[in-house]
From Swiss-Prot:
The family this protein is said to belong to: Belongs to the CN hydrolase family. Apolipoprotein N-acyltransferase subfamily.
GO CC terms of this entry: plasma membrane
GO molecular function, one term: N-acyltransferase activity
Transmembrane segments annotated in the record for this chain: 31-51, 65-85, 89-109, 144-164, 181-201, 215-235
Membrane-topology annotation of the record: Multi-pass membrane protein
UniProt entry keywords in alphabetical sequence: Acyltransferase, Cell inner membrane, Cell membrane, Membrane, Transferase, Transmembrane, Transmembrane helix
Organism from which the protein derives: Bordetella bronchiseptica (strain ATCC BAA-588 / NCTC 13252 / RB50) (Alcaligenes bronchisepticus)
Protein name: Apolipoprotein N-acyltransferase
Main location, first listed in the record: membrane
Pfam families from the UniProt entry: CN_hydrolase (PF00795), LNT_N (PF20154)
A single BP term in Gene Ontology: lipoprotein biosynthetic process
Entry keyword annotation includes Hydrolase: no
Gene that this polypeptide is encoded by: lnt
Length: 547
């Protein structure tokens, strides 16, 4: 019997809940192996597609899609409980309620997608045998377009939270070859099409596979094959010599990181790791990169001796240092103050006064801030006050900021979950209006210690891998507790440190130049394709329907 077939009232909700839970496992290779993520994602989503398309009404389709997504988000984002309860100090029932409330909101987007697709694709019209192939192809394309459109809306509504976009389940699948052209939203469209095509193979009326309904599945296989071929193409070319980097993972326990009594301990650990001499045969680093908020207080709250110690590290190693630090600055001629979550770069020649005032030449200010963690949305001060989260209410950085020029390479930094928003990374890779060339390397600094050693770390690494595929640029990630890694321009993890362990990762990273179609146009091609499919679906929906 099909998931949408007759049976006890509890059967279909149970199947959708189980499929949603399985779907949550497909976004990072933990606990499932990497090769299984894409098949699990497509099969699980096919259950939701079939159930929603066979629903008796659009309202019932919304409920079925919402239930599936509710279980997917609740399990896939369980690590938010760790942040709110273990480190935010929120009572366990309230932390659990927070995860469920967010999941319920996020699940509205897939639910609405299922409702829209069901409204555009009634289950039993135009069902004559000659028309079945056309109908299943149309239905699969329409369902996929609705799903991908709502994935995109989830990425932009209320600052956006596109975590667990289904495209990330396909980093190691043939569909990844489409990333340089269509980005994650285009991959989501193709993955949703594959799921809907699989759902179309199952004919609920007879319980048998109907060969007439295999056209959409055949198209899905062709798209996967084309993705594999596209994946063989090189979209960028090397520029300059490889850059030697040292990535530092301090592994400072989150419960201790912002404790004033333990501030010196954390600083000393990072100083020691940054000061380690190169191993035998290992070249000296051109740049040492430390994670987000290595200094857990504003830079002007530290004595000059702390900055003297860091300058001494740069002097002894004959290198430059980039570190995440919260900055308190007062722009020239301004009466107000700015507070930013930033990365600063310096070397042995940098005056201490520049470091204490936050006026170093190399600086990046985070532009996409975390709601409740880095700024307070209107009406939610009460919620933030319940959490023990320091360093809130930051100011935003500019959309395009200068790269860090190091040894012939240009590094574009991003902080925390900014690498989740692919279009916002693109201005730094493109040539500036002043003719300044775009970045050749991307670097993410983050502190995922808020989430413990959970799926969040592996999911974040998958997100970074897809950004490199979209842009054909390498990316390095320096994190507090993991996963510190180097990813090449094809999305392959070249080196990584185990999570939950202090250490340094010496890597040689080859900078790349040249723009992929996605790096040039961002989400526009994918959105245009989604829009055309929706327009075609709406136009077909107005035609007279056969009984």
């Amino acid at each position: 019997m099909s998931p949408a077939g007759k049976g006890p009232a509890w059967r279909q909700p149970a199947i959708l809940a189980a499929a949603g839970a399985a779907h949550a496992l497909s976004f990072a290779p933990d606990p499932l192996p990497a090769w299984s993520l894409a098949p699990v994602q497509v099969i699980a989503l096919a259950v939701a597609a079939h159930a929603s398309l066979q629903a008796p009404s659009a309202r019932r389709a919304l409920a079925r899609g919402w239930l599936f997504a509710m279980f997917s988000f609740s399990l896939g984002l369980y690590w938010l409980y760790v942040s709110m309860h273990d480190y935010g100090g929120l009572a366990a029932p309230l932390a659990a309620a927070g995860v469920l409330a967010l999941s319920a909101f996020l699940a509205l987007f897939p639910g609405l997608a299922c409702a829209a697709a069901r409204w555009l694709c009634p289950p039993h019209w135009d069902a004559s045998p000659p028309a079945r192939a056309r109908r299943t192809l149309y239905t699969a394309a329409t369902w996929a377009a609705c799903w991908a459109a709502l994935e995109w809306l989830r990425a932009v509504v209320l600052t956006g939270f596109p975590w667990l976009n289904i495209g990330y389940a396909h980093v190691d699948s043939p569909l990844a070859g489409w990333a340089p052209l269509l980005g994650v939203h285009g991959m989501a469209l193709l993955a949703a099409f594959a799921a809907a095509a699989l759902a179309g193979l199952w004919q609920s009326a007879s319980g048998r596979i109907d060969s007439r309904q295999a056209l959409a599945a055949g198209v899905a296989l062709l798209l996967a094959g084309a993705g594999w071929l596209l994946g063989q193409f090189s979209w960028s070319r090397p520029e300059g010599k490889p850059l030697h980097l040292r990535l530092v993972q301090g592994n400072v326990e989150q419960s201790q990181k912002f404790d004033p009594a333990l501030l010196e301990t954390g600083l000393r650990r990072h100083l020691e790791l940054a000061s380690l001499p190169p191993r035998p045969g290992e070249p000296k680093p051109d740049l040492i990169i430390l994670p987000e908020t290595v200094l857990p207080v504003f830079q002007d709250q530290l004595p000059a001796s702390v900055w003297d110690a860091w300058i001494e590290v740069a002097r002894r190693a004959d290198t430059r240092i980039a570190m995440g630090v919260p900055l308190h600055t007062q722009p020239d001629g301004a009466t107000g103050h700015r507070y930013t979550n930033s990365v600063i770069g310096f070397d042995a020649s940098t005056p201490v006064e520049q470091l204490r005032t936050g006026t170093t030449a190399m600086r990046y200010d985070k532009q996409h801030l975390v709601p409740w963690g880095e700024y307070v949305p209107p009406g939610f001060r009460w919620f933030v006050d319940m959490l023990d989260i320091p360093l809130g209410d930051f100011d935003r950085g500019a959309a395009r900021q200068p790269s860090f020029d190091i040894a012939g390479q240009r590094i574009a930094f991003n902080i925390c979950y900014e690498d989740l928003f692919g279009p916002e990374l693109l201005p730094a890779l493109q040539d500036g209006p002043d003719g300044r060339p775009g970045a050749t390397i991307m670097a993410n600094v983050s502190n995922l210690g808020w989430f413990g050693n959970t799926w969040a770390l592996r999911q974040h690494l998958q997100i970074g891998r897809l950004r490199t595929m979209e842009t054909a640029r390498p990316m390095v990630a320096a994190t507090n507790t993991g996963i510190t890694a180097a990813i090449d321009a094809r999305g392959r993890v070249a080196a990584a440190l185990p999570a939950g362990r202090a250490g340094v990762l010496p890597v040689a990273v080859q900078g790349m130049t040249g723009l992929t179609p996605y790096a040039r146009f961002g989400d526009k091609p994918a959105l245009a394709l989604i829009g055309l499919l929706l327009i075609a679906a709406a136009a077909r929906g107005r035609r007279p329907r056969q009984p």
